[in-house]
Amino acid sequence: MTNDGLLAQMAAYEQCVLDRDRQLAESVLHPDYALVTTNPALMVTPRTSWLALLPDYIVHSWAVEEHLLDVRGGTAVAFQRIDMKATVLGTDRSGLFLISDVWLLEDDWRVWRRHSTAITAAALPAQ
């Protein structure tokens, strides 16, 4: 069994962030998706709030420095270190990030959780 479907969905998820493409995002996100950030404090952003934020999440550059993918049955975990330059709600959100995505295979692969830890970036602005 290959991971082609998973890899295609992972590429689509990255593309929806870069292009701020809500329609593509809705096809990739699990219905129970949430973004979990940890710096400076734990914050959970549910799917509807993340989709609402997407137009104001402007990525100027995105470089994957490290990538590791583990797959077991219908669960996959992707770990990445990302160097990103971005503006979120008008605030600079550039820096290094450690990102772990949990993917679930149901009708298709969907990202269920993204855990993002900013190593060098400023805190997310208040929403």
Where are these regions (language model features)?
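A beta-strand edge to alpha-helix "cap/lid" segment located at domain peripheries
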Residues: 1-27, 34-127
